[in-house]
Structures are given as structure tokens and as C-alpha cells.
Amino acid sequence: GFGESFVDGDWSTPDLVAVVRLAVRNLEGLEQRQRAYSVLSRMANWLRHRGNRNTLEGSRRNIAYHYDLGNDFYRLFLDHTLAYSSAYYSSEADSLESAQMAKYEHICRKLQLGPQDHLLEIGTGWGGFAAYAAEHFGCRITTTTISQQQHDHARQVFDRVPGGDRITLLLEDYRNLRGQFDKIVSIEMFEAVGFGFYDQYFTACDRLLKPDGIMLLQTITIQERQFAHYLRQSDWIRKYIFPGAELASVVEIGRSLARATQLQIFHLEDIGIHYALTLEQWRLRFLQAAGEVRSLGFDANFLRMWEYYLAYCEAGFRERYISNVQILLSKLG
């Protein structure tokens, strides 16, 4: 395929994002031609993806595949807090560091956080958001992850940051959480839930959120008209980078909320263009650190795979084939 041939070194280009953007614009035509001769290959990819469903056991396995590449690897191209989600830019001139801090601030203000709040974070990452919220907004935080690598790093972060004593860190699946919280936040963890588990996820959030509480969900989405087709196949990202991952549908999120919960959407902000800028900075930093990536034991194919992955995602956001949203939910009292 297109991505595989780049990874294998069969072709190269000085502007990979431009090439992938062109491919995205012609995606429907490419898919029609592919259907004529690659049904068996597509079925094999779909079956492989189905084998990576996000059950309790499957979720841990899928998360480990991606995030347990090692913290030293991610330090090479992420900001100092290791935020692995879209930043928030006031202008294209913003640094990655300042844009990630702006994202944390933006989310905290949307949630109206204060010292009176007990916030649940579903998906700790490397602890950057929880550390920021505890230090700057004074709230108590319970945060959970299922990645051992991220858990161990976040523990070290919380032990040294101001307000870290207000943070409780768990190594637990969201389905097993207990208690109730004033606010909930989940930043780009939802892609690891999977469409078949929407009701289970939102039922858990509904149970964990106090009456009159609010929740912010930040997630990557795909065009609504592409969603049904997207679910029926696997793709390059899910095959090589994120097993078990699925982009979200805002429409299906709304249906799940109505079907299974007392939660309702009261605000939505599309920040897809911010993700394109974030990915561009990640990609440039990754390429600048190529020598250090190799020193960690990764080969040339791995380098090209990650270059393609970052360019592929950036192109998708720039063409608005995929996007990123922050959804505010309220729970009826």
C-alpha cells in the first residue's frame, strides 16, 4: 500500500504532508479502485482490527503497544509535560510549549475548576494536565491510566509539583472506577474506547459524575459521512500505530448519551486546525531527533513509519477529513 511503500523506502518526497493531502482529497476515488482488487486484504485488516477490541484485557494490550515504546522516546518530540494531545494556539507563531499550557488553561476554565472541586481525569497520559490543574486551580484530582509506563512517570511528576499532594493516581480501567466526582475530564482517551463500547463508557461517566456536574471530552473525530465505512475496515494507523483505536462520531456520541445516560451536550468547540499545527511541530521535532531515536534502538523503517504517521495525521486535519473537538456535557440534576 501507499504507506507501506514509503516505510519500505520505495519512494520519497521533500513534502510528505503535501503528497498525503493530495491522496486525502482523492480518497473516495482511490477507495473505489481499491475495492476492485483488494477485498481480501481489506478483510484481513478488518479482522485484525476486530481482534484488537477494547475489552478490559484488550484495552491494556492495545495501550501498551503504543505508549510503552518508552518515555525516553516520547520526550524527543513532545513538550516538557509530554502532552500527547492537541495543543491550543492563539497564533501559528506560538511555541509547542506555550500552546500546550494554553490547552490546559482553556480546559480548566471551561470546567470552571476551583478548590471546591474533586475532578476525575480518565486517561492520565504522563500527568501534565492533572499537575497543571492542581497547581493553578487548587482542585483535588483523581486520575487513572492503564499504561504502566505513564503511571510510573506521572507518579514522579506528582511527587515534585506544587499541589501534587491533592492528586490521587490510579492504575485502573475506567469501567472499574467507583465514587462520584464534581467534574470529569478525558483528553483524547476516547479514541481507545471503540464504537462498540460507547454506551459502556458514557454509562460509567454518568455514574461517576454528581448531579449538576459537568464533563469535558476532547476527542478526534472523522467526517460523519465516512463513519460507517470507516467502521467496516481497518486502516494504516490502526494496523501499525494504534491497534484498537477508532476515531469518534459526534452524532453517535449524541445518540449514546441519549440512549444510556442523563448527560447532554451543551457546548462543542472544533479545534481541528490546532491539531494540524501540533502535529507539524511534533513531526519537525521528531525528524530533528532522528539520531537520538536511532540511539534508542529503533531502525530506519521505524523512523519512516513514524514520519509517515505524523504527516498522515497532519494532512487529515489540514484537509478536514478528520478533526478534534472539545465537548462539554452536563448531567441533569
Residue ranges and their predicted role:
Residues R175-V185:
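A short acidic, Gly/Pro-enriched loop at the edge of an enzyme's catalytic core
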Residues D199-P211:
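A short glycine-rich, Lys/Arg-flanked "PGG" loop and its adjoining helix->strand segment in the class I
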Residues A154-R155:
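Conserved SAM-binding loop
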